[in-house]
Structure formats: C-alpha cells, structure tokens
Amino acid sequence: MTNIFKQIVSEILVADHIVITSHKGPDGDSIGCSLGLYHFIKKLNRRVVVCHPDVAPDFLRWMEGADDIIAFENDPEKVKSELDSADLIFCLDYNSPDRTGKDMQDFLVSAQGKKIMIDHHPFPADFCDIVVSDTACCSTSQLIFELIDQSVNVEKLDDRIGTSLYLGIMTDTGSFRFPSVTARTHEVIATLLKAGVRHSDVHENVYDSNTLDRLQLRGYAVAEKFEKIPGFPVALISLTKEDLERFHYKKGDTEGLVNVALSIDGINAAAFFMEREGEIKISFRSKGDYYVNELAMQHFSGGGHKYAAGGMSVEPLNVTIDRFKKLVPEYFA
C-alpha cells in the first residue's frame, strides 16, 4: 500500500482545508485514528479539523485534542460549514456514509471535497475518491500508523500521535487478545512505545476510571438482565431506558458489556440490546466458528466484522429481542 499512502500524503500537502470524519457512536478506534491523523496533519502545517457525528464518551475525553472535535449533535451548522469548505475529507473507520447518522450523512455526501476512506470493515460503499480498505488489519488506527510509516517516516511520530494510535489499537483488539492481532500489530506497538507512549496510563484512563454508577449499572446488567438462550451457546443482555435512568447512565457506561456476556463459560455468541429514544442499539460479539456480521447486516440494519458487529432496530425492545431469539437457530446452531 506504500504508493497509495504516498498519494494520500501528497493530497494532504496540497490541501487548504482538511476535515476528518468518523462514525456515529465513537469508540476508541474512531477517536484514536481521528486524533492520530489530526496531530500528524498539524505537524505538516495544514489546516485540519475533526468533525464527528456525536460527542466522545467520558472515558475517551482525556485524549489530547478530544476537546477540539466538533460534534454534529451539538453544532450541525458548524459541521456543515466545515464540510462545505473542505477540499479534502477523510472518512475513517466506516465503510458507508450512513454510518455517520441519517442527518450528517447528507452533508457528507453533498460535500464537494475529495474524499478518502481509510477503514478495516468489509464491503466498502462507493462514495470516496481514494479507498484504503484492509479487513485483515486489526484497526483503522494501525492503518493510520502504516500511512505515516510507509509514506513519510516514523520520525514524524510523537507521543500525541502515538498515544492516539495506541488507544485505537488497544481498544479495537480487546487489549491485544482478538484474532485480528498479528506480529505486525506488536511491531507497531513497539514503535509507539519508543515514541514515548505511556501504555499503562492509556489503559488506566480507559479501563480503570469508573464511576460508582457505571459499575453498579454493569453489575445489575449481568446479575439481573443476563439471559442464556436454551439449547444454544448464545446469551444476551438488555437494558431499558428505565434501567439506564436508574443508574444515571452516561455515554460509554455500557462499553464492552457485550464482551462480558461473551466471556462466560460456554457462550460463543452474545448480543447486547440498549433502549434509546426512538431506537434500540445492538452490539454483537462472537468467537470460534460463530459469526455475527451477516446477522447484523441482514436483519438489524448494521454490519461489521465476523466476530464484532452492530445494528439497530426501531421496533420495541421486547419485539427486537424476540426477533433475535427466533434467528438464533439459523445462525448459531
């Protein structure tokens, strides 16, 4: 990919105004790759802003540059203005414009600037001028590292860029335990550590900075809302709006909860359903010979990787869960 990465850097160097976008529901990789690229472009002395559909959760707000992110949910006119005036738009960690949300996607698609997709999800939509799509890569943050490494040199790395990319790789690999991790991933991490990344600080900020409400919500979810599907190695956890209100839910409090269900002995696939205003947010995880991306794509308006996918439903929570249960024999027998 060296040639395409060099082409992308050439586009950066001649651009007057660059906008970095990512998907709705920000996670460690979307924040990490966006800020990693943001700090890199700033080192090249180009004008750049980050525009995301919504605000980062609290456990990611400590990142340097996170407060500079313009959230569409807070200031849609500002995001529209930035997109309209951009001559280069990065689409990071998503494969289709609808992943930015039904409102922001219209402004993204109509923007006239050249669009560059860098992503690791399958089935990229045809809406960008330059596409880097590598489903074998563990994270988009690692792809941003490769962009820097193969087109310029790693001397352009500093602790701000490195910390951002480390965050994205760490979170999207489940702290380096998912099958997507390769020897190259560890080589990249070694380079980031040499650049000054304080890896223990990143882990502590993400995983060891809980509020009491967050821990109590997660305990309640496992103790009271966990359900195993009889006859199948499948489990689910569901939370209603009332559950969330009871524990003073804040964005990010349920991050990784679906993995807790998957970690239980004998469970090979898990789903998490969270009731929000007007829709149900769904997360799927699996392991071994059980895949969830087709289920998410075909039945829950979503998609993702074989072992990690997401979706949504506008049906009531109980109806959505019943529909999932009826699909279990087809996908997880």
Give the predicted meaning of each segment.
Residues T2-K24, G32-E64, D68-I70, E77-K80, ...:
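Hydrophobic helix-and-loop "lid/oligomerization" segment in the mid-to-C-terminal part
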Residues K24-P26, Y94-P97, H121-F123, K241-E242, ...:
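Short glycine-rich anion-binding loops that position phosphate/pyrophosphate groups of nucleotides
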Residues G28-S34, P97-G101:
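Short glycine/serine/threonine-rich phosphate/pyrophosphate-binding segments
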Residues V49-V50, M117-D119:
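Short beta-strand "acidic-cap" motif of Rossmann-like dinucleotide-binding folds
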Residues M63-A66, A111, F127-C128:
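Short, structured coil segments at secondary-structure junctions
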Residues L83-D84, Q105-G113:
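Short, conserved loop/helix-junction motifs that constitute active-site signature segments
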Residues L88-M104, I116, F123:
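Glycine-rich phosphate-binding loops that contact phosphosugars or nucleotide phosphates
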Residues I118-V188:
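Short alpha-helices
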